[in-house]
Amino acid sequence: MFSNQYIQQRIHKANSLREEGKNPYKNGLKRSLTNAAFLEKYAYVKGLEEPKDKEKCESVVGRVKLLRLMGKACFIKIEDESAILQAYVSQNELNDEFKSLKKHLEVGDIVLVKGFPFATKTGELSIHALEFHILSKTIVPLPEKFHGLSDIELRYRQRYLDLIVNPGVKDVFKKRSLIVSSVRKFFEMEGFLEVETPMMHPIPGGANARPFITYHNALEIERYLRIAPELYLKRLIVGGFEAVFEINRNFRNEGMDHSHNPEFTMIEFYWAYHTYEDLIELSKRLFDYLLKTLNLDSKIIYNDMEVDFNQTSVISYLDALETIGGISKGILEKEDRLLAYLLEQGIKVEPNLTHGKLLAEAFDHFVEHKLINPTFVTEYPIEISPLARRNDSNPNIADRFELFIAGKEIANGFSELNDPLDQLERFKNQVAEKEKGDEEAQYMDEDYVWALAHEMPPTAGQGIGIDRLVMLLTGAKSIKDVILFPAMRPVKNDFNVEGEE
């Protein structure tokens, strides 16, 4: 692993420090200010004419990002999480320690500098070192400074390196943290209670997806990593909670692309005595709050598309297929004609798909990617909505919506099915679909039906994909860009180091 010549040179320098009686992995020294706080506190120091006050001594830390040696002095750029700060180190101040520094210090090392503020000839606020300590000696060179880390695959596999050399990446994940905390704060302000439900389920449910399977040794039974928390959250509504939410991971054993990762973060929330129309209004308020919190305009650019949050619309599923997808009602209303149409368009579909699933295929191919401004699509076919409430005036459609922005599904919500007999029949239909080969059809969950039999009040529930939400609000083009450690195919890592900084 460490046979590379550049690594061996650094290991030799670490050992050389030990021979001088210095621990290359020192502990216990503390900074007095972050780099950003130093720059703010001493911003009044403008030039060399400013008196140098050695009594104003501070300690700062960071990773060496740039090193310029000039005989008996050197300039060092050090970076902590807050900012980059320049340090000036001279032999006049450090004496023999300066010789050790010149011998051992390299880009990538973690250091502590203790000194006073001053400004260079160019007016750059810096710290004039009185003490200098190597806290952690790097033994692997960073990627070449002018080109950074551009290999996409390597960036995802070695995210720690990506964060070191690409400053914008860290900004994305700071913004992700702000988005998640803002979503949490919004729901708390709306009166929702945050809860936690199981991550391992005896029966996978809450969504149509293929689960990951694990084994519980103590119980000697299989368990499933959850594909959604929905059925547990609705059990809480049965139990008397009226507004709950959970922000956590879901797992779906399916394909990966630029908008899908098998392990992803969602918020799901359930609201007793409300309907899906109330959720639409709540979603609008949520986005208004997020745009304000993130200081974003109502118009944002995503993937070269202008998304205008002031142009939010609501349209029914069939109307979207007709007016946006360009498919006539005569075709949409007849299962055989719709199947023939899809095949004519070159779309591969199974001949035994139900009418509702054929409509879903048509929607995915002809409508979804065209929904740029926030669009709430309502009145979904009941066949593809096994947990949603039937519409009172048309039992073939569900009181359900999905929110699409920039051509992607962002949220799914509906008035919840709370009729236990209807739910039991829907589960039976799902089991029949599974027996026909539909691996994503839902399992029978009699325990959940029994919970519903104790009656759940009229309730509306919704899920929002946090990762896609972060993509939208940060402009990220791939879901891997907003997940710190995305799923990757295993490879044998040769830990190759191609060159020195």
Swiss-Prot record:
Binding note for cofactor: Binds 3 Mg(2+) ions per subunit.
Main localization, broad class: cytoplasm
Record's subcellular location: Cytoplasm
InterPro entries reported in the protein's UniProt record: Aa-tRNA-synt_II, aa-tRNA-synth_II, aa-tRNA-synth_II/BPL/LPL, Lys-tRNA-ligase_II, Lys-tRNA-ligase_II_N, Lys-tRNA-synth_II_C, NA-bd_OB-fold, NA-bd_OB_tRNA
Keywords from the named record: Aminoacyl-tRNA synthetase, ATP-binding, Cytoplasm, Ligase, Magnesium, Metal-binding, Nucleotide-binding, Protein biosynthesis
Subunit-structure text: Homodimer.
Family: Belongs to the class-II aminoacyl-tRNA synthetase family.
Name of the protein in its database record: Lysine--tRNA ligase
Organism: Helicobacter pylori (strain J99 / ATCC 700824)
Upper classification of the organism: Bacteria, Pseudomonadati, Campylobacterota, Epsilonproteobacteria, Campylobacterales
